[in-house]
């Protein structure tokens, strides 16, 4: 992997991790175009995912600081309830990661047709959430957190956008737009770090090898994903507040159809 390929893929990851267009799907498409092999993908994926977590920490640091200050008061306050909701949202993805990891990895290796189909599903979900207008609630309940977590678990499929699925689900439940966007980006931090840790352990045990990726390519990929992630995170929060997700539904529909046509 050259540094230029790493920069392009890093930009793709940073932008699509937050925008509702599926980072896994776009990374799969980009990797296929560049002819990047699976062992290279694993190492690079770990690096760019950690980069997007760092961008979330930077952009949402004020909210994270608020959570920890309230949490260490050791009482049942809004901050503690927020953390409980995040933990509840992690349950479905945790179950998928523990019991269905091999099945999910097999799907990732099944080609781009599944990516195209899931992009169309993302488009349908975003469209439905745009036109359906439930009564808005002020707070995200524990029940809502679990349902949003189910959406996140389904979004392990390549091409099905995680942010698109979780935000659209929350909108259909009537959750506050601004709070929902922040919750969607914060709830993914533990699963991403957990997956990165497991993949790192897997590589160190020798079950997978790091491909011949130069250190420069990894650094460039990290920086590209971090910068793009910071910009996309701020942009996406404003997009959700303004209710402009329909434009991404159109994009996902076009991209999904294009991928499917190329695979026929």
From Swiss-Prot:
Reactions that this protein is recorded to catalyse: di-trans,octa-cis-undecaprenyl diphosphate + H2O = di-trans,octa-cis-undecaprenyl phosphate + phosphate + H(+)
InterPro entries: UppP
Annotated GO MF terms: undecaprenyl-diphosphatase activity
Cited function: Catalyzes the dephosphorylation of undecaprenyl diphosphate (UPP). Confers resistance to bacitracin.
Name recorded for this polypeptide: Undecaprenyl-diphosphatase
Leader peptide range in chain numbering: none
Additional remark text: Bacitracin is thought to be involved in the inhibition of peptidoglycan synthesis by sequestering undecaprenyl diphosphate, thereby reducing the pool of lipid carrier available.
Record family assignment: Belongs to the UppP family.
Location(s), subcellular: Cell inner membrane
């Amino acid at each position: 992997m050259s540094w230029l390929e790493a920069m392009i893929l890093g930009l793709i990851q940073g932008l699509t991790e937050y925008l509702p267009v599926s980072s896994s799907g776009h990374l799969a498409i980009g990797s296929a175009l560049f002819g990047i092999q699976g062992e290279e993908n694993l190492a690079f994926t770990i690096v760019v995912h950690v980069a997007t977590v760092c961008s979330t920490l930077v952009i949402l640091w004020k909210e994270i600081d608020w959570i920890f200050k309230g949490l260490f008061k050791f009482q049942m306050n809004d901050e503690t309830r927020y953390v409980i909701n995040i933990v509840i949202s992690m349950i479905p993805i945790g179950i998928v990661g523990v019991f269905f990891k091999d099945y999910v990895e097999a799907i990732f290796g099944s080609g781009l047709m599944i990516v195209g189909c899931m992009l169309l599903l993302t488009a349908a979900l975003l469209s439905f959430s745009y036109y359906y207008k439930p009564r808005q609630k002020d707070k995200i309940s524990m029940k809502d957190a679990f349902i949003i977590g189910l959406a996140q678990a389904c979004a392990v499929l390549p091409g099905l956008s995680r942010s698109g699925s979780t935000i659209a689900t929350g909108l259909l439940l009537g959750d506050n737009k601004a709070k929902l966007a922040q919750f969607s980006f914060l709830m993914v931090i533990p699963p991403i770090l957990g997956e990165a840790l497991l993949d790192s352990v897997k590589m160190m045990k020798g079950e997978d090898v790091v491909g011949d990726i130069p250190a420069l390519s990894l650094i460039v990929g990290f920086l590209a994903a971090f910068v793009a992630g910071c910009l996309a995170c701020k942009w996406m929060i404003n997009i959700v507040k303004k209710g402009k997700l329909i434009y991404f539904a159109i994009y996902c529909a076009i991209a999904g159809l294009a991928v499917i046509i190329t695979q026929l």
